[in-house]
Amino acid sequence: MSHPLIARAADREVRQAAAFRDAAAAMTGESLRADFEIEQQNAPRLADSGRAYLVKRSGKPASERRKTRDLEHLGSALLRYCREKGESLALPEESGTLELLDYQVRVKGARADDPATRGIGRIDLLGLIDGQRLAVIRMRFVEPGARRCGVGDTPLHVLLDGLAHTAIASACRENIAREVAERFGREVSPDPPVLIFLASPRYWELCRKRSAQKGASWIKELTRLAGEIETETHIPIQYLALRLQGDPGWSYDEQGPLLEGKPLLSDAWEPGADRVKPKPRARARSVAPVEEIVEADLSRPARVYAFSEQYLAGDRISHPVLGEGVVQGLAGDGKIRVRFDESEKVLVHERVASA
């Protein structure tokens, strides 16, 4: 298989909200490293066809929103904001900066339906960490008022797809670095690229709502995979949230998409979100006491019921209305329980007869 990570990303269990956690649990950094290396070996080489990764765009810019092109328009707006402000995006916890280079970066020269490269798309955003290390950014956007994510668009699917595109960028790093140096005057470090999974807060919220304990189990697995993948491939993985101002967060002018305010990057989830709470122990079901039926003591003679008489458990009595019965025991002061056929009645005894 030429592109095993692309194939994994398209797997049915990977794309199912109810199944992707188990699919992630079955994966290891070692197995994904093998797939990553195959992706590198079979990576399309855009430079071989004489085409550039970083291109100067021409034509009329977008003037209105199309939801099917939200990622493209958001990427354009982010890049425009950073260039007009002359600044990079701050990574969470002052861990560095992210300088954006281009959006919707093409990585293959073949047709979209070419079997050899089917499933390989464009890189949503390409950037530099601290002005040096290449960053491949895979994005997902869900507007603040959305009630659901896209069908089949699970975090594991995006992670595997992003890892495949990072493998391509890693294989073509020298050509990309040369273009970055020529166009931006930046020297790209020889370190492997960083993969950033960047999504709107609502995307993360909806993904977590679909799972128990706010997604703790799948967050745990994706966190584990990120650590194992970095150990095996030296590709760091960051899960981040992109906070925008407004809804959806950008508008349009004559130059195209324009952010409505400063974008902020934060961690995708809070510390401890991957802590899975143990299931509470099942409570022992209370068992209803088994009713014990006192059998008649045949050694005692049957007696006609009279409220002034004293009766003990096992006594046989004959009631003028209820018929034959067996005393089961006391039912309180001056009362007895008597079983007649399948029913039980409470009668009085030891009562003093009135003069």
Give a label for each model feature.
Residues E174-I176, W218-I219, E295-L298, V304-F307, ...:
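A short linear-motif detector with a strong N-terminal bias
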Residues V304, A313, P320-A355:
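Basic/aromatic-rich interaction segments and small domains that mediate binding to polyanionic partners
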Residues M1-A288, L312, G329-L330:
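Charged, terminal alpha-helix-loop-beta segments
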